[in-house]
Amino acid sequence: MLSGLLLLAGCGNPVQRKLEGRWLGESVENFDAKEVAAATGWARGLSLEFAGSRLTVAVPAEEPRTGKYKVASVRENDVQLAVTRADGAVDTTNLKLDDERSIRFMIGDTRAVVLRREQ
């Protein structure tokens, strides 16, 4: 049993493998009509890059930030990540895995930024 657990630990989390790569913001969902244009502009400047256990987040008008992340929980296609910042603080973020080419970065319970895998 222990050897099986060690083998699984060495393989990495299956969700982590699905996230691997660079994701680019494309659009937004469930924003008020008056916010859609600005939110879409911001979303198109957003990128998430997953490399091993590292996550780099780039947002418009800010320097990219990199931290170590782990998959905190998975429920169907809902994934919660725990991301450790350079100062040691831990942030959580929620994603919805739509398919191998599309994820949604959740903002609250209903709003989302849709990201597509970089080709």
Please provide the spans of the model-predicted regions.
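Sec-dependent bacterial lipoprotein signal peptides
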Residues: 1-10
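Beta-sheet ligand-binding and adhesion/scaffold domains
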Residues: 77-119
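N-terminal helix-cap/turn-to-beta initiation motif at the start of protein domains
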Residues: 11-24
